[in-house]
Swiss-Prot record:
Its EC number is 7.1.1.-. The lineage of its organism: Bacteria, Bacillati, Cyanobacteriota, Cyanophyceae, Synechococcales. It catalyses: a plastoquinone + NADH + (n+1) H(+)(in) = a plastoquinol + NAD(+) + n H(+)(out); a plastoquinone + NADPH + (n+1) H(+)(in) = a plastoquinol + NADP(+) + n H(+)(out). One of its GO terms (cellular component) is plasma membrane-derived thylakoid membrane. NDH-1 shuttles electrons from NAD(P)H, via FMN and iron-sulfur (Fe-S) centers, to quinones in the respiratory chain. The immediate electron acceptor for the enzyme in this species is believed to be plastoquinone. Couples the redox reaction to proton translocation (for every two electrons transferred, four hydrogen ions are translocated across the cytoplasmic membrane), and thus conserves the redox energy in a proton gradient. This is NAD(P)H-quinone oxidoreductase chain 4. The keyword NAD applies. The keyword DNA damage does not apply. It comes from Prochlorococcus marinus (strain AS9601). It is found in: Cellular thylakoid membrane. It comes from the Bacteria. The chain crosses the membrane at residues 12-32, 44-64, 96-116, 120-140, 144-164, 176-196, 220-240, 251-271, 285-305, 314-334, 340-360, 384-404, 425-445, 472-492.
Amino acid sequence: MLGTLGAGLSNFPWLSASILFPIGSAFVIPFFPDKGDGKEVRWFALSIALITFLITVGSYINGFDISNENVQLKENISWLPDLGLTWSVGADGMSMPLILLTSFITALAVLAAWPVKFKPKLFFFLILVMDGGQIAVFAVQDMLLFFLTWELELIPVYLLLAIWGGKNRQYAATKFIIYTAGSSIFILLAALAMGFYGTEIPNFEFSHLAAQDFSQKFQILCYVGLLIAFGVKLPIVPLHTWLPDAHGEATAPVHMLLAGILLKMGGYALLRFNAQLLPVAHAQFAPLLIVLGVVNIIYAALTSFAQRNLKRKIAYSSISHMGFVLIGIGSFSSLGTSGAMLQMVSHGLIGASLFFLVGATYDRTKTLKLDEMSGVGQKMRIMFALWTACSLASLALPGMSGFVSELMVFTGFVTDEVYTLPFRVVMASLAAIGVILTPIYLLSMLREIFFGKENPKLIEERKLIDAEPREVYIIACLLLPIIGIGLYPRLVTESYIASINNLVDRDLTAIKSAAKANIFSGTKKNDILKAPTI
């Protein structure tokens, strides 16, 4: 009987359920009565988000083999055969950690949204639709379906910004949709080009595209378009300007979803498409990714240091930390690429915690200007402790997840011999500047908020209260995996190391083939990148 139950669980459509359950449940919300403060809707949304999280955990426990590098939990249903479109979902080591992260952060974001009283039905409807849509982005195995789910996620974010944002919410929401929807056209063009390549019958499945022998020029064209599209979402400097504006106007739960999940979609897509499906082009553009990663780290760290708005300071900090993802993806090292994956998970947790605290602090002080915040530590001691713990995690304190992921990226890049020694030394030295700046701007931020001379107007008028049990619980739920991963990173790395090794081997083979074909001859890349001995 137990064997039958186990077989049934392994055959259960876990991923389809985790995608369709929150989206389908969201359409129940309009039938809730409009009277009251939305208490029933909040509890319903929280229940659905928690069940979705349990479904994703069930998919990992019952159907996912961490030693298998291939796609698992595969579901393939013909949807629109004339267009070559199938409902194809699955998970490998690169997608499963992010699926779990998405459902986990969303459940906490629903709890963070407990104070929302304005249009609660629409708010939680959008959150649940966003939950299913973001899981779908990481789970789909069809490139055209990937484009559709990528676009589906944009609509809830736009509405959450435009309706519940700050005074400049319309500008921020419009800028977000122009940047992200506008750049998404490159995903559609690349999907159509790759799906129709060499055939009149389109096939958009990842497995088919990975087996295709795309020409070098074709790969380069697709790579550039996809780099722009995914670079907007990551974001890569100078395609980043929508993010500080979006974070500057968003509410705390939307902050958590933006920083915790949305940015990771860009990093995941770069791994899945640029590095995995276009290896020859990746061999040529990887040095550029390294340079862009270093620019992200330094530029965003310096800009964060200069910000006087708390939300924008943390937003630029996020951009800086995502630079390590770019370096890891371009490193051609199993350790470096593994570090990029871990950095996405780590920053998802840390970014969500910091932005939640930004929202909680604003709810009390009603200001985001650091010049108006000072001396509130005496009134909010628990809040100060929470801020300190999350800031230490963000500055990569040993024993926390950020330290491990950044160390893996640095070590993987510096010790790998694919790049020449001078290039590695210069890039690592420049990136280290950003690492040094991080504790400076974060610790100075803590000092300005919680220490110094008290602002009498702020203290007297706002009647500041300390952290509530709900807020402590949310931060505790985020800090637990942050510390757990920091102390024992194999909790996460074991789930994707087989897939990462397979990806890196594929890219190293592409470098060797490119060198034999003299692709780098006549360019300066051969002074940076050299063919490995495989």
